[in-house]
From Swiss-Prot:
Keyword Membrane assigned: no
Species per Swiss-Prot/TrEMBL record: Cryptococcus neoformans var. neoformans serotype D (strain B-3501A) (Filobasidiella neoformans)
A Pfam family annotated for this UniProt entry: HEAT_HEATR1
Tagged with keyword Metal-binding: no
Any one of the GO CC terms: small-subunit processome
Family in the record: Belongs to the HEATR1/UTP10 family.
InterPro entries: ARM-like, ARM-type_fold, BP28_C_dom, HEAT_Utp10/HEAT1, U3snoRNP10_N, UTP10
Protein name: U3 small nucleolar RNA-associated protein 10
Amino acid sequence: MSSLAQQLQSIASLDAARLTSAYGAPSGKSYLFPPDVASSHDIDSIFDLAQSGFDELLSLDPEMEEFEEELFSESAKRTDRMVLSKEENDNLDRTLGRCLRRLGKWIRLMAGGKCIEWMVRRFRVHEMNVDEVLRSFLPYHESPNFPRILAIVTIPKTSPYYATFAPLVKDAQPIPRSYIVTSISPAKDKSLVLLGDIASMVQQAVKEGVVHHALLTFWTATMVDLLEGARHGKGANEGVVKQLVESFVTLLETPKAGEDVNAAVYPPLVLLTRTVPLADEPFLAIVSSLLTPGTGSNPSQRMLTLLVILNDRHTWSLGLGEHATENLAKVSQLGEILVAAMDKYRFEKALNIVVKSMLEKPDLHAKALATVLEHESLPTSVTELASTNLLQLGSSTDSQEVKAACKSLLTNLRERHPSIVDTAFLQASASLEIDTHPVDHGLVQKPSGEVAFLDVYAADISSRVTGVKSVIDMAKKGEEIESSITALEARLSDVDENVVNALYEEPKSLLEILPVEKYIAGVKPVFWAVSPISHIIGLHLDFISQHLLVSHPEAGKQIYESLLFPIFLSTEKRQPLTKSQALKLLNGGFKKLDKLSTIGPEIGKAREEGMKGAQKGNLVIAKALAGATLSSSTFEDDISFLIAQLDSTTSSARLLAYLILHSLVLTLRGPRQLSTSLSILKYLSPRLTGHSLRDLKHADENVNTEYMESVYKKPEETRTTLRAIVSILAAMGKVIKPIGQIVWLSGESKAKDASYKTFAQQIYLWANIAILPANVAHFLLRSLLTQLGEEALLFFSSIWTSSTSPVPLRISALKHALAFIHAYATLPTSPAAQGQPVDFQVVLPQILIALQDSDKDVRRVAVDVLRSVEGGEGMGDVYALDTIYGDRSEMTQLLKSVDRKKYIETLLEVAEEFVIDRLRLKAFHTEVLNMQSGKNRKESAHRRAIIGFLMSHVASYRAIDPRLVLLSLLSDVHDTSILRSAIPLLASLFDDKSEESLWLSSLPDGQQALYVQALMGSLRVQSVSVLGEAGGEGWEFLLNLLDASKSSRFIARLRILSFKAMVGGVFSALEAHQQIEYIIALIQCIHALPTDDALDAVKVLEKLDIQPRVLIELIEHLSDPLETSVNRKRQRQDAADEDRPTQAVHELITFVDSRNWPSIPASAPLVASLMSILSALLAKRLIVKEGIDYLEQEVFGAILALVERITDAQEIQRAHVGIEVVIKVIRASTNPRTAQRALLVASELARLIPDAVLHNVMPIFTFMGASDFQRDDAYTFGVVEKTVSRIVPVMTQSLKEKAQNSLELYTKSLTFLSIFTDMAGRLPRHRTLPFFVHLVKSLGASDYLAPVCMLLVDRATTKAGRNKESVSTALELPANLVAAFDVSVKTQVLGEIVQELARLIGDLSKADKEAFLSQTISENDATDRPLRQVTYLLSFLSSILGQLRGKACSQALVQSAVRQLIVLAASTSQPVMATTDIPSNLHKTLASTMLLLSADNFLGVTAELLSDGSEQDIIMSLGVFAERLPLIKSEVRLRCTKVIAEILKRIGGLLAASGATVNAALEAVKSVIKTAIAQEDGALASVLPTVVGCIGKVKDSAVIVAALSLVELLVRRLAARTIPFIQSILDTSLNLIKSTKLAATATNQAFVTLSSVIETIPTFISSKQLNAILITTIDYRRVEETNSASLFTTLAKKIRTKSLFPVLIEAWKTVQEKGGDNEMKGFFEMLRLTLKNAAREDLPSMLKPVFAFFLDVFDLRHRLQLKGVDTRVVNDVEESAIGSFLELVTKLNEPTFKPLFIRLYDWAVIDLAEGKNADDGRLTERKIVLLHVMMGLLTKFKNLLSPYMGILFPHIQELLPAFASGSVRSEPLWTLLLNVLGKSFEVDSGAFWTDALEIELLPQLVAQVPLFLPIAPSPQSPRPISSCLANLAGSTTAENVLRRLNTAVCLATRSDDPKVRLAALDALSAIWDAQAEEMVGLVPETVSEFLAELLEDESKDVEIAARGVLAKIEKVTGSLKEYLE
């Protein structure tokens, strides 16, 4: 393999979808398109799509340019990630990451989607950059974009996003934010990796400058939700808090992060501080970060956030961090921010912290601190803090700047809060050291400058005067200029004369200080005041006149408009200008003002005394100002100012403006009059809505006395203003119409036309709406119509055809038009006056427009107008013929009188229908004007005359709405004349400078589109003949639309409409030569147009229906440049000629690609024509620069689509279609896609010309093996599959004919099959299986599936074959291949594989190889390759069996396979396989195969092998039989009883032979027993004797155990059927138990076998047999107790007591003879179990001998002691005997037991008492037995046996004194007696003992204390007497008994013998332990009388013991020191 191939293969896992085109095919998954659509786009189309998106993004985001070269260029198109090195891929990953993050902003735009599509399809970012992709899309998680990308991503398990999003990929959908928040929470992601990833998204975006709104919104919301969850849950995890704090601080400190980023941090930051109690260090870090400068944050937002978190932290005292003061100084408008926050939220705590930091450097914060401290609602705490800190700092600092700042702040503060500042001053004075830093009292005193500014605003006049003077003095010195200007500006509006005089005291200084604008702004309120003071105005006028205008004459216009204008008009209540003040306007600087210089005298005259004089003066001034305005050089500005004053709130200014404008309207002439009037109308129109002026009397165009009186007396009333409006509107009637013709019916007009048309329409509107007084309205209308004259009808037409005219106005215009038409005859200038008829047809189109009006009333009046213009048949003078459309009127076509009359009459016939339905007019024209069959030529001429008439008006009428209405009338009329008329209009749009084009360009886009669409609507199928007219413009127009060299703003829209018409049927109606010409022009146009336009053209080309004959001609035309003439002489050609072949290729590509070849009728000549393209391309391959590969591919695709539908082979042959060209293209082309399509064509031609194809079959397969097998795309493998399906069957048929059997067929096909199987490792993984499935189906699965699978398995045996795959991976392919076929084929393969396994295993020991796979082994192969072949075939076989499990398979094949596998399994003992896994694998395979075989067949195979198999085969078959038999269901077993019986019979024979098969035979029988059914018991019984018999023949313990186990199972299974064999079983088992040589396991199993016999058939075991069993078991107990105990239990439970007890009695004799303690214990254990399991009904008859037996047994102690047996042994034996006795007692009731107990008492106490002393040894022994029995009874039965103490009590009273006196000295008896008494006290519960009995017994018991002192007490074994007395004390609560007991024992402590004292103290200690609480009352006497003495005892041991007793008492009572003193 080449090194390049190795490299490609090594990275196949990174890019499994291999790239196939010249630059590689795109990834199969798509972001934008569904899979079926995505597969149709190759890399070039995706690149073009990406380029368009990238270009659009570049215009939006120029920074995208950095990715152009690397990701969006031609070189990027060739970038193949598969062949890049790791370093190159890493660099590319970084670039892609940056690009994806920048694209995050544009994801919702289509342009962004296009770029992402490119990155998915080209760079596979959805697989290789998944994390970056998901990060970019996460902000859009709830939009459709997110599931679109999520559905295609492949998330690696190592990604932090895997756990969250991998489960969602399959069913991708928008996800809620709550899901993401849960995923990043510590409960879901303990590593917090995902949280860190998301938290860092904004930081990364800021770093790269790619922040966008969606990202910030997502980030903030996610962080907030995460913290909200923690807030309402268990709190925030420490790791989460750490990550969030770090993220927030980092973002807040990021330079130039911007306002949006910082705003995004604030909500989660505040929530964090409120949710989590942060430590001081992270909190300080957050606070410090909020003060970081240069971050681009909004200062208000940041400071508010800081204040919020500081205010929430109530105990914060660590300040704002280092450099906080300096950073605060950099906050813009800090003071205003703090004041606003203080007003709204108070924030007192936080404000203290911030102000404290600012006060550290007050010079830096002087302005901000002043703003805060001067606030009226400043908290007291802040005031106190500021006072203290400023005093301390100001007194201690050496810096003059700091001291000045402190002083300024303190003085201002003291003015507002004197008491607080003074208190702080006193406190500071007391705290500071007087000597070093005395408090500076000057800090709290204001400087003189500040006093001055305060005085300026003082209420006192004198203070204001002083302040003004001081401020002016300061300003003169250059101090506080800005503040001075502000203060002086404020005082300019002062109304006190003294203050004003003070201001103007130094006029020059004032001018120098105040800018003119500031002066005018300051003084303006005085002039515009409601009640101005004239003498104050006079002072200001003096200054303006004498100083201001002298220094600043340029301010004259501003002074006139801002100050003087409102004071000109005098009213009754407002007279700002007296005569003396008015005269001031005549002098000084006012003389230089334009307006005042001409009206000075009038102003003076106007100010006469008296009201009438004032009214007249107002009019005089207004006219004078109007005249001044008229002559002004700034006329337009003045008019604008006057119109603006019409809205003034100051009535004087407003009314004066009305008066001036009124005068101007009347005096102006020409354009100025018109423009001024229009401006006034424009202003008034919207403001009069809702007002009515009709009730204003005496209103006209003149300014009358009533009007002026209202102005003077009632200026504020609305009615006065309305009168002024009516007066000025009435004056509009004096406006004179411009000289010359006005084109009323035109959308375009000259300036003068437009102005007057607008004016006339406005006046007409005012005159016709019910607002104006009637006389004014009539006057305006009469004036207007008088000036219009004959043009009135055209004017009316312009009104009703205008869409902007209201309905009432349209109706009025129509009515006026009707009146005009009737009155026209009376006009002197009218032709009717001379007796000539008047033809009004020129307005007929306008009437038609009115007939389509939306309002019914309009249509009704329009009908009346239509009737009025009907006229007669004569052709009179045509009204307005030359003027209606201005210069375009000559284009108007007139109707003949006949046509006119007929047309109007026809209209009038249905006129009422027009009124009812506005659409009826269109339907009428459609009916009348459409061509109708049967109509004569005259009718056609009439119809065309009307169409021509209407279309001429369309061409002349340059107004969009009328044109559209008229065109709509003809939209459904089909006539060629419409198109002829429309073409000139359309053609004129080619020239952008033409009038038509310029006019259309001025319209809105919507209207342009409607108009062009309406014109192009005339291009219909019915008008196609116009396109073919000689000399016509139609065809040229269409071709020009396809001429890319022509540019026009409308050509693209026209082209699209023409395309629509062509597709709509026009193209199909063209002649063939026209179709060819159009298609060629269209193709050339596609290559010359921009991309988007070209795409539209391509879509049109695709939709055009082209017939095959035209297609053939087109192909000839388009491919002509590719044809090479042999005889053509070589000559120099220019560059255009050289590029012509390339251009032809592109044109052919466009054409071929546009056709839907599957829908084109199949034609062999057409195929031949396409083949000719391929032939021509072969000759031009070296010349053509680009596109040849794609063209070949498309041509092949076209050929394929046609050939697939051709069924007649003769047709192909007649057309001379061959395969040679196809083969040549395959050899010549380097593009795999071309060759693939060629293969498809070749495959399809194989059906029609098979001989030619088969002749070239080897080149086909050579190509496939060399290229296509290694490519990964669906198309390539579709080609391969089709090729295989067509050609492979032919070859396999030949092979089948030559082979005799399957092995021979496999061998002959080996070379052929190896071609494919050798390529398996180089095929793309996901394509491999589908290919081989298709291959096998083509070969024939029944014949070839097995050998193909064998060869695929054989690949795994060599490294080269595996091709770097693992063995398991290599074996997956054959397994998956088999899985694709049905069960029958799989079963057949199973048999073949088993046979091949047999052959391979056989070949291991043969020289001549037989197996199929042995043929693949060469001399150079490793020696273990055959073993690997076997191993891997077994593995493959297992996978087949897994697929067949549970399926119905052919039993014959499976049975054969099973038999073969069993034989193979038996033969795996060869040395060569000993060290391999082959044997175990073979067994597993056999087990799996058995699952496929029916039980009947399996048993049959077993029976056959048992009869004719070798020893190894028999062992193996028995093993399989044992393993599989339990799996057979009972109903199946019932059916197979005979077979199983036969098998058991043969197994019996094997057991009798005792050979190597014994163990396997035993396991087989065991398997039968465990699952046997009743019908098999007979056969099993026949095997039992042979099994028992074989036990004695074998020596191996394991086999013996197995046989015994089998006997046990047989006995339990067969029950009574085993009776004949009981003796042999018992003998065998007992002999094994007695044997000393056997292993323990064999002995154990022998006991189990015995138990099974006893449990199963107990009644059939004889006494002799039982005795043997008992004796043997008792003897064996010496060796091991467990088995014996188990057998004892079994005997006691299963054998009846009546039968067993005599045997026990008999056995007792044998046991006594042996005399061993172990045997005795075993016997008594057996006796105990017998009595325990005895039936109560059996006991009465046995009781006497049983009790006698026990009495004899109880005397055993004596007999044993005589033999010298150890006492411990005697006690153990006795305990065993007593235990047996107790079991007997358990079975008895009291009446039966009591006599027995009395008899036992007599036996122990009385029988031997006569004649013997009390200490006789035998008597003592019997008493000990009695007490042992009693102890056992008390222990077992508790208080139930307490009454029986009464029987013993007399003898106890005898024994205790006897022990005390020393007459009885048996310590065991004494000990047992006291223990019995203690146990009796313990369990009594009042059953026997009473206080009297206890008191009676007490002295005797206390007398036992000094006895047997050598017995040392211990916690584990206390002295018997101490325990007895403690139990006595614990059994009673009687004070009398306890006191006596305590006293008696205490008295014993006074014994002279220290040992006795110790014994007494031990007893006393035990007593107090048992009953301390009840004996508390005895403490004084016990402690003070006895223990006090004992604590001083001479014996140290006694003292220690006494202290121990005292300590126990003190645990209950506390300290007892008082009793010891």
